[in-house]
């Protein structure tokens, strides 16, 4: 079974979300998602300053197997992207919850967090797949 850190929130589309000390949220794809995709070859990052709505596709992870859209788990403004992925997309595989993060977002409606899954609910989703 994939590693599912308890402190994160999760989307049904296999993104994770972590609240940072400055009030922004870091977003990436889960270990399960990167296992399904296989070795990353490119990550198309969103534009810093872009405004997105929850559920919008805002990035693309391209692997040796497929290209997969990455969705914004909450609405808000993209405030940072992980430029390290330009040279090292494999960080998504090796460190999905650390160095392989994809973007940071300043949430415009924190009530949307309530629709995300906690670790227990996400693990149950994985068991049903």
Swiss-Prot record:
Domain of life: Bacteria
GO cellular component, one term: glycine cleavage complex
GO terms classed as biological process: glycine decarboxylation via glycine cleavage system; one-carbon metabolic process
PROSITE patterns noted in UniProt: BIOTINYL_LIPOYL, LIPOYL
CDD domains registered for this protein in UniProt: GCS_H (cd06848)
Record PTM N6-lipoyllysine, positions in chain: 65
Keywords per UniProt: Lipoyl
Cofactor: (R)-lipoate
Chain segments annotated as coiled-coil in the UniProt record: none
Assembly with partners or alone: The glycine cleavage system is composed of four proteins: P, T, L and H.
PANTHER family documented for this protein: GLYCINE CLEAVAGE SYSTEM H PROTEIN, GLYCINE CLEAVAGE SYSTEM H PROTEIN-RELATED
Function: The glycine cleavage system catalyzes the degradation of glycine. The H protein shuttles the methylamine group of glycine from the P protein to the T protein.
Family to which this protein belongs: Belongs to the GcvH family.
Stated name of the protein: Glycine cleavage system H protein
Organism ancestry: Bacteria, Pseudomonadati, Pseudomonadota, Gammaproteobacteria, Enterobacterales
């Amino acid at each position: 079974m994939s590693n599912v850190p308890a402190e994160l929130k999760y989307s049904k589309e296999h993104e994770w979300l972590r609240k940072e000390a400055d009030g922004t949220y870091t977003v990436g794809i889960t270990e399960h998602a990167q296992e399904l995709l296989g070795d990353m070859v490119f990550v198309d990052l969103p534009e810093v300053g872009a405004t997105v709505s929850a559920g919008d596709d805002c990035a693309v992870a391209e692997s040796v197997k497929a290209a997969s859209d990455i969705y914004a788990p909450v609405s808000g403004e993209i405030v940072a992207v992980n430029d390290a992925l330009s040279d090292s997309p494999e960080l998504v595989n090796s460190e999905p919850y650390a160095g392989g993060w994809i973007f940071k977002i300043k949430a415009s409606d924190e009530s949307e967090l309530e629709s995300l899954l906690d670790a227990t609910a996400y693990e149950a989703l994985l068991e049903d797949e």
